[in-house]
Protein backbone atom coordinates (compact mmCIF):
# COMPACT_ATOMS: atom_id res chain seq x y z
CA UNK A 1 0.00 0.00 0.00
CA UNK A 2 1.08 3.58 -0.48
CA UNK A 3 0.97 6.73 1.58
CA UNK A 4 -1.16 9.80 0.89
CA UNK A 5 0.28 13.01 2.32
CA UNK A 6 -1.96 16.06 2.75
CA UNK A 7 -0.23 19.26 3.84
CA UNK A 8 -2.20 22.31 4.96
CA UNK A 9 -0.75 25.54 6.30
CA UNK A 10 -2.78 27.62 8.77
CA UNK A 11 -0.94 30.76 9.88
CA UNK A 12 2.38 29.37 11.15
CA UNK A 13 1.13 25.80 11.67
CA UNK A 14 1.66 22.92 9.29
CA UNK A 15 -1.05 20.27 9.47
CA UNK A 16 0.15 16.95 8.09
CA UNK A 17 -2.49 14.30 7.41
CA UNK A 18 -1.16 10.85 6.60
CA UNK A 19 -3.24 8.07 5.10
CA UNK A 20 -1.95 4.58 4.37
CA UNK A 21 1.41 3.13 5.37
CA UNK A 22 4.42 5.08 6.62
CA UNK A 23 7.28 2.62 6.18
CA UNK A 24 10.70 2.33 4.58
CA UNK A 25 9.09 2.55 1.11
CA UNK A 26 7.26 5.83 1.78
CA UNK A 27 9.30 7.52 4.52
CA UNK A 28 11.70 9.43 2.27
CA UNK A 29 8.89 11.00 0.23
CA UNK A 30 7.08 12.04 3.40
CA UNK A 31 10.26 13.45 4.91
CA UNK A 32 11.07 15.46 1.78
CA UNK A 33 7.57 16.93 1.41
CA UNK A 34 7.44 18.02 5.04
CA UNK A 35 10.98 19.34 5.06
CA UNK A 36 10.44 21.41 1.90
CA UNK A 37 7.27 22.94 3.32
CA UNK A 38 9.03 23.77 6.59
CA UNK A 39 11.93 25.38 4.73
CA UNK A 40 9.77 27.42 2.32
CA UNK A 41 7.23 28.73 4.84
CA UNK A 42 7.56 30.38 8.24
CA UNK A 43 6.24 27.30 10.04
CA UNK A 44 6.47 27.28 13.83
CA UNK A 45 4.29 24.29 14.80
CA UNK A 46 3.30 20.92 13.34
CA UNK A 47 0.07 19.02 13.88
CA UNK A 48 0.48 15.44 12.73
CA UNK A 49 -2.88 13.76 12.11
CA UNK A 50 -2.44 9.97 12.03
CA UNK A 51 -6.15 9.08 11.97
CA UNK A 52 -5.93 7.34 8.59
CA UNK A 53 -2.48 5.82 9.07
CA UNK A 54 -2.83 2.04 8.93
CA UNK A 55 0.80 1.03 9.49
CA UNK A 56 4.08 2.56 10.61
CA UNK A 57 7.53 1.08 11.14
CA UNK A 58 10.78 2.46 12.54
CA UNK A 59 11.39 4.45 9.33
CA UNK A 60 8.18 6.34 10.06
CA UNK A 61 9.34 7.01 13.61
CA UNK A 62 12.54 8.44 12.14
CA UNK A 63 10.57 10.81 9.89
CA UNK A 64 8.49 12.03 12.82
CA UNK A 65 11.49 12.45 15.10
CA UNK A 66 13.37 14.35 12.39
CA UNK A 67 10.50 16.82 11.88
CA UNK A 68 10.17 17.16 15.67
CA UNK A 69 13.83 18.17 15.92
CA UNK A 70 13.47 20.52 12.95
CA UNK A 71 10.49 22.33 14.52
CA UNK A 72 12.10 22.43 17.99
CA UNK A 73 15.11 24.20 16.44
CA UNK A 74 12.84 27.17 15.57
CA UNK A 75 11.22 27.18 19.02
CA UNK A 76 8.06 25.40 17.90
CA UNK A 77 6.05 22.39 19.00
CA UNK A 78 4.71 19.21 17.44
CA UNK A 79 1.38 17.70 18.44
CA UNK A 80 0.24 14.28 17.20
CA UNK A 81 -3.46 13.45 17.03
CA UNK A 82 -5.94 10.70 16.14
CA UNK A 83 -3.46 7.90 16.81
CA UNK A 84 -4.67 4.34 16.19
CA UNK A 85 -4.01 1.69 18.86
CA UNK A 86 -1.33 -0.04 16.76
CA UNK A 87 0.56 3.18 16.04
CA UNK A 88 0.10 4.31 19.66
CA UNK A 89 1.79 1.11 20.81
CA UNK A 90 4.79 1.86 18.58
CA UNK A 91 4.97 5.40 19.98
CA UNK A 92 4.76 4.04 23.54
CA UNK A 93 7.52 1.49 22.94
CA UNK A 94 9.79 4.07 21.32
CA UNK A 95 9.26 6.65 24.05
CA UNK A 96 8.15 9.37 21.60
CA UNK A 97 5.12 10.22 23.75
CA UNK A 98 7.57 11.40 26.40
CA UNK A 99 8.60 14.29 24.14
CA UNK A 100 5.70 14.71 21.70
CA UNK A 101 2.25 15.71 22.93
CA UNK A 102 -0.75 13.64 21.80
CA UNK A 103 -4.34 14.84 21.46
CA UNK A 104 -7.59 13.11 20.53
CA UNK A 105 -8.21 15.00 17.28
CA UNK A 106 -7.03 17.85 15.09
CA UNK A 107 -9.18 20.47 16.80
CA UNK A 108 -7.76 19.61 20.23
CA UNK A 109 -4.25 19.60 18.76
CA UNK A 110 -4.71 23.13 17.38
CA UNK A 111 -6.17 24.25 20.72
CA UNK A 112 -3.13 22.80 22.49
CA UNK A 113 -0.99 25.07 20.32
CA UNK A 114 -3.23 28.03 21.17
CA UNK A 115 -4.43 28.64 17.61
CA UNK A 116 -7.94 27.16 17.42
From Swiss-Prot:
Phosphorylated by SpoIIAB on a serine residue. One of its GO terms (molecular function) is antisigma factor binding. In the phosphorylated form it could act as an anti-anti-sigma factor that counteracts SpoIIAB and thus releases sigma f from inhibition. CDD domains: STAS. The keyword Transmembrane helix does not apply. This is Anti-sigma F factor antagonist. Keywords: Phosphoprotein, Sporulation. Coiled coil: none annotated. It comes from Geobacillus stearothermophilus.
Amino acid sequence: MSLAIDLEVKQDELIVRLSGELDHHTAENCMNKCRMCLEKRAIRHIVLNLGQLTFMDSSGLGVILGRYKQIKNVGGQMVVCAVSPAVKRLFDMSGLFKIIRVEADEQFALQALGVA
